[in-house]
C-alpha cells in the first residue's frame, strides 16, 4: 500500500475547501482515507493553511509521498521538510 498525502475536496459549489489527507494512492480523490492531517481554505484572504504538525511529520517519516500541491502547501506553512513529490 503506497500512502500519499493529497487534497480531498469539501465545501460547496464554487466555494471549495480542502482536507489534507493520508490515503492509499489507489483510492479516489474524495474517497476513503486513513487520516486527515490538515486543511486548506483558498477562499480566505490570504488562503488559510493548517496542519497537525505531529501527524504530518509522522506520515512523512513513514514514507508517505506528498502530492505536488501538498508539498507546496507544506513549504508555505513552513511546517516540515517534505519528501520529493511524485
Curated annotation (Swiss-Prot):
Any idea which GO molecular function terms this record carries? structural constituent of ribosome
InterPro entries, per database record? Ribosomal_bS16, Ribosomal_bS16_dom_sf
The superkingdom listed in its UniProt entry is: Bacteria
Provide a GO CC annotation, any one.
Answer: small ribosomal subunit
Keywords attached to this entry: Ribonucleoprotein, Ribosomal protein
Report if keyword Nucleus is assigned: no
Q: Which Pfam families match?
A: Ribosomal_S16
Can you cite a GO biological process for this protein? Answer: translation
Asked if Phosphoprotein is a keyword of the record, the answer is no
NCBIfam families to which the protein is assigned, alphabetical: S16
The similarity comment for this entry is: Belongs to the bacterial ribosomal protein bS16 family.
Q: What is the official name of this protein in its record?
A: Small ribosomal subunit protein bS16
Which organism encodes this protein? Answer: Myxococcus xanthus (strain DK1622)
Give the gene that encodes this protein.
rpsP
